[in-house]
């Protein structure tokens, strides 16, 4: 067992877990002051619920081993409650539980991302029901499609879901998704779009009506997300080696370029570059580089960042043109950014991209993976959300939304600056 790599993976897991509190600040600053508690609680609720489900059965579904190389849904019953993962096989590079912890943080942040689409108007209890069901029937299986890493009987490292191993058998190459452009960002973005349609628009929804109540929170959240993203991307190599270093550098270069690209578009479009734009641009670049961070030259990572920042800055206005209320631009940043990064690899992935190999295979595989995850997640998220809305109710009453969801749902206010009563 390599103690250095084990420490690297555990540190990466801690960094990725920090991303969810970072997301809470990012989302919390973007909403109205009377919704900040509700918004942040949806992220922290995801930590609690998904952390438990992952240990009980989530890992067993997401990483079913050899049986999951082709099947779209399978389960390793021996991994339920992590029962067969407590011992480290001879020759293994690191303890299985280190990998379990690392991937748990991916499941948590993916679910939390979806919540941004339903800000200001969702019941906390209904959100928790959705989070648990969606994670079970969507995230856990989709993670197996893309990742399904595992330790073989001889302790060697093997992987392959149907989007990797299965498509490779057909096209000669599997999907390249280094850290989750499909399984995390396209997946969450598609679910966010579905929930935005199910819950409908906020009261008074219109461009310019709802402005972020706390831009410093947004910047703080973006900074924590960026910091944690080094664990997300570099940690996905599962070894402290040259590929991890490449992923680390690209996690600096792409979001930095995206930040600039977003600000340029914002200046041209709206007349002023904003702090929220800078934060959103950085996140858009982080999303786009996620699938590509280990497979791109840094120069092409910068180009990807510029494209993602500029396109996502334009994409966030689609909700006003198309009439859906994606409150915090999960669709415009995560779905669009994830699609850009995933498809970009079809052209410029080292060795297999169209511009390097002359073959369309990688681009075709990337498109199949992106579309498959998008459709699967959207359809099931819509069905789950619709059933919740028609049974226990997903959306608060309009008068409660106007009064302030924090008080109605949680009995708290985000900014009570007064001495506590004795």
Please name every model-derived segment:
Residues 1-422:
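Glycine- and aromatic-enriched membrane alpha-helices
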